[in-house]
């Protein structure tokens, strides 16, 4: 159902001055088409009103809501309909239609200790996640996530998610990397609930279908520009309607950032082109910190030459990695877990095989993932999407030949720092402080449940658990219909000025050229293995690229569906994420999880955990690296770093914290 506000219809018929010339801007939307927002069952936005306080060149509309969610992937949808279900007047702003969000690309599954394949316990899942994080994960948040996991999966089942089934009718659970029984002593766990190899697709459509039951107002194809901050509080967001070029200020008591990751900072990645770190950059521009951005996960099995994801579920179903000699080489690197070691371990092992001359193909620059020893019926029922993807992108029939694969950027462990309730935090004078009115969840956030390395199938769990946590936290502290905090009349003025500047900029370098330079710099200088000299050179190169942003050239001077402008705004966001990633990596003088330094090959904790700690002198906070990086970027692109302690305590005595130890599989 589309509708048109009276104030909105008047708005677009006003005369606008664009780029120094007066143009008559007739209404681009009529009652027969979508105007300012698209709603299936959402409330009619009677609060929308015209404003000329920040621009006489662009139509500006002000809206009031109890809560605003930015992003409509798995985390954003779960937060949005959770808020609407609790009675909050909620807006969900998204730059693309909800079911086109990148959650749709997740393949393998969602972890939960249901115990359908063997006895399982959420505390074992907790242990595996802490170990997988290389002891950089916050154990209170990991406790919350893993304890909530079984109920979250059952909730999805009740929403209608069509999980794969065992012969007994239970939810089928496959093996995934880094998952064990009995605190690592009971063998491989089967904990990953799946819908064949299209779990993300099913999850996203299930959540979107569920969301239509509630009174959520969806603002589809709206590009969020910046947070509206007043006196250290978040009071909403400002966004561009890409369909007609109008500017919208959303005033709200609570704002949830669920904008996903920033995989497109790298040249080769599994991320959609829309994964541009928009929320992460918005927080950075607001003067707030980001956390642990140097930890970037390289998925072991991206299709060679294409980067498309081949799910870890392939190895969970029995697939193996082989080198040019036909050797199952993971037996040498992870004697127990083998091909189901954690992703950082497998990616490094593959890279070493290639470096030492045992790569496959004429250039010996990749390895093979072998599936053809598995029954064709198993491939057809459990991995149908992979069979199709391998044929399209690699020309491989998986029933007869192996898939050429190479580690590819896949996930960002770092993000906007939050506590386990989803509240965004800063670190002031040695203490965590909540940013009033601001929440984050999903890949955009760092709770930190993934620490230095995420376990496969914990990401979809992260989405639903912390999307729900944001809604619950807001419902605990606020009531629907409470007065919306005020904003300054000129709030968002800088955002509109930046947009206008980019729209008419006429420098010498195209957006696409700058973007590819940034991506190749990140790919070449912050890859699977890193060294100080290469990272330092990468920092210098990236800062130089960032300094040329003022010399950028755009071509489209229009305002309706100006994709040139939107891609340039996305490049600004990517650049802020890339700068913090590479500077954080250069500063971290150790190897931990996905951050592997060849010049600092060991993990540096407060104690040497390879030996008994009795008699050891505890290192001071400044001497060890078991701490979170907090990064800031000023208006000139200068990165500054601080650090905050890892939380080692759990929520209660139901779960005992896991002390650091040597991490092996």
From Swiss-Prot:
Component of complex II composed of four subunits: a flavoprotein (FP), an iron-sulfur protein (IP), and a cytochrome b composed of a large and a small subunit. It is an enzyme of class 1 (oxidoreductase). Its EC number is 1.3.5.1, 1.1.5.-. It comes from Xenopus tropicalis (Western clawed frog). Residues 1-45 form a transit peptide. It catalyses: a ubiquinone + succinate = a ubiquinol + fumarate; (R)-malate + a quinone = enol-oxaloacetate + a quinol; (S)-malate + a quinone = enol-oxaloacetate + a quinol. Keywords: Electron transport, FAD, Flavoprotein, Membrane, Mitochondrion, Mitochondrion inner membrane, Oxidoreductase, Transit peptide, Transport, Tricarboxylic acid cycle. It is found in: Mitochondrion inner membrane. This is Succinate dehydrogenase [ubiquinone] flavoprotein subunit, mitochondrial. The gene is sdha.
């Amino acid at each position: 159902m589309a509708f048109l506000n009276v104030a909105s219809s008047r708005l677009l018929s006003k005369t606008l001055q664009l780029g120094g010339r007066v143009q008559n801007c007739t209404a681009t939307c009529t009652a027969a088409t979508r105007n300012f927002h698209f709603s299936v069952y959402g409330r009619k936005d009677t609060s929308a009103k015209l404003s000329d306080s920040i621009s006489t060149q662009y139509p500006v509309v002000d809206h009031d809501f109890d809560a605003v969610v930015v992003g409509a992937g798995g985390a954003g949808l779960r937060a949005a309909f959770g808020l609407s279900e609790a009675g909050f007047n909620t807006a969900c702003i998204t730059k693309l239609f909800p079911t086109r969000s990148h959650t749709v690309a997740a393949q393998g599954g969602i972890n939960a200790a249901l115990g359908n394949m063997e006895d399982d316990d959420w505390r074992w899942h907790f242990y595996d996640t802490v170990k997988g994080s290389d002891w950089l994960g916050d154990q209170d948040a990991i406790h919350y996530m893993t304890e909530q996991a079984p109920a979250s999966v059952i909730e999805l089942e009740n929403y209608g998610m069509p999980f794969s089934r065992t012969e007994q009718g239970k939810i089928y659970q496959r093996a995934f990397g880094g998952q064990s029984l009995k605190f690592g002593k009971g063998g491989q766990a089967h904990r990953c609930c799946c819908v064949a190899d299209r779990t993300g697709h099913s999850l996203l459509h299930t959540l979107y279908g569920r969301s239509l039951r509630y009174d959520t107002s969806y603002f589809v194809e709206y590009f969020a520009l910046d947070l509206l901050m007043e006196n250290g509080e978040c009071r909403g967001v400002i966004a561009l309607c890409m369909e007609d070029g109008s500017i919208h200020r959303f005033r709200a008591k609570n704002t949830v950032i669920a904008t996903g990751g920033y995989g497109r900072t790298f040249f080769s990645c599994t991320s959609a082109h829309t994964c541009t770190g928009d929320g992460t950059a918005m927080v950075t521009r607001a003067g707030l910190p980001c956390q642990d951005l140097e930890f970037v996960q390289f998925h072991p099995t991206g299709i060679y030459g294409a980067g498309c994801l081949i799910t870890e579920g392939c190895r969970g179903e029995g697939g193996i990695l082989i080198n040019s000699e036909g050797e199952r080489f993971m037996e040498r690197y992870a004697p127990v877990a083998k091909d189901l070691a954690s992703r950082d371990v497998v990616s490094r092992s593959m890279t070493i095989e290639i470096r030492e001359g045992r790569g496959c193909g004429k250039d010996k620059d990749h390895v093979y993932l072998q599936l053809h020893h598995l029954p064709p019926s198993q491939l057809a029922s459990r991995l149908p999407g992979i069979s199709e993807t391998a044929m399209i992108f690699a020309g491989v029939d998986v029933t007869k030949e192996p898939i050429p694969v190479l580690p590819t950027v896949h996930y960002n462990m770092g993000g906007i720092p939050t506590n386990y309730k989803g509240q965004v935090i800063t670190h002031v004078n040695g203490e965590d402080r909540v940013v009033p009115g601001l929440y984050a969840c999903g890949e955009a956030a760092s709770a930190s449940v993934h620490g230095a390395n995420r376990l496969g199938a914990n990401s979809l769990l992260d989405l639903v658990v912390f999307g729900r946590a944001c809604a619950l936290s807001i419902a605990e502290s606020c009531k629907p219909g409470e007065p919306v905090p005020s904003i300054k009349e000129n709030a968002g003025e800088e955002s509109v000025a930046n947009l206008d500047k980019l729209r008419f900029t006429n420098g010498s370098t195209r957006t696409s050229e700058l973007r590819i330079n940034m991506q190749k710099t990140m790919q070449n200088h912050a890859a699977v293995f890193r060294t100080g000299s290469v990272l330092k050179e990468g920092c210098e190169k990236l800062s130089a690229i960032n300094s040329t942003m003022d010399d950028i050239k755009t071509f489209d001077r229009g305002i309706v569906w100006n994709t040139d402008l939107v891609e340039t705004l996305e490049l600004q966001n990517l650049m802020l994420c890339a700068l913090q990633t590479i500077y954080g990596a250069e500063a971290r003088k150790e190897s931990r999880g996905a951050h592997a330094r060849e010049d600092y090959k060991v993990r540096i904790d407060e104690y040497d955990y390879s030996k008994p700690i009795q008699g050891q002198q505890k290192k001071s906070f400044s001497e060890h690296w078991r701490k979170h990086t907090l990064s800031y970027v000023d208006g000139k692109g200068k990165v500054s770093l601080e650090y905050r302690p890892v939380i080692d305590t759990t929520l209660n005595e139901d779960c005992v914290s896991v002390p650091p130890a040597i991490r092996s599989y």
